[in-house]
């Protein structure tokens, strides 16, 4: 079927892509802290002498072990806060610390050593919650980000509320409704979308994400998973697809100062959803238009799987993106609904349940595993093999399987998430 431009699904899917495929420089959780800190400092009108942060446990998990870019290798919540205060430009949003000069890098270190920055675990039921209070002389500013990385819900200065209604649900409802996402409609949209409607978005994704993957291959970042794959596994397209996605993560998790186009609020998911598809399109000589349509499939499938799980979870988000890239690769090979649906189910059955233990270099290895599952999921179906309803969390019907994955990630792994965070915090204190 052909989807017309005025169709409700067409406009919804296009809006979702525009909301989600945005640029971010640095791992998005520390960057969200830097963004909030920069905005709060602007409202305060001065560099604070004291800062108190109250953050949800998942923020601690995702900031603890990742390098904050443009800080000369600093890690952690305090470093992200200092970077935002000293060098942040809040109008750049998730590229808030993309432009930091050498003098500012030194000022960040000095500020960290001389300033009281206190971090507390927030007494909050919200998975994504950042509350920043800054003090300068007799003035203070409170700022809160909730639910997703750029959603400022409250700004208060000296007792006066200057922004926000206090309604934490308002930001989520302002996003385009994800309930309309389905595998069949995503494929229909990808077949029908006018290229001019998505070209600018996808050109940036191709350019930015390919650039950081090349940097990961050429530099010495993290555990160099991408380079190890190419050196030890060979140069087949299946290996290159995994290696490029892993190399992008190698670089990003270790502070590479290049932006990426994210997906579901995550750079790792944005790279995993796109780089394997880009690599396969080059190998197959698919052409520009086919690549764009395959990227529409991979990005929207990733978002569809991730929606039920939520922004942050104990369920590793790149698993969703690995399923997405597998779907995009199936599309490049001429696959339709059956091929894509079975690819997703097969891939999800293989790697669902890999835990998220925060942003750090080993994410690159998980990306390699997720992409491998996506490719294997497609190749299994091509060979007439599949996992069937009743095999573990696999249900009859792709949408039922996706719903099971969402339930597992959002509800089933809540206690797992708590124990992962307990382990990580105990490591910090020991």
From Swiss-Prot:
UniProt record, GO biological process: L-cysteine catabolic process to pyruvate
Listed GO MF terms: L-cysteine desulfhydrase activity
Domain of life the protein comes from: Bacteria
InterPro entries: Ser_deHydtase-like_asu, UPF0597
SS bond partners: none
PANTHER family named among the record's database cross-references: UPF0597 PROTEIN YHAM
Similarity field: Belongs to the UPF0597 family.
Name listed for the protein in its UniProt record: UPF0597 protein DSY1109
Organism placement in taxonomy: Bacteria, Bacillati, Bacillota, Clostridia, Eubacteriales
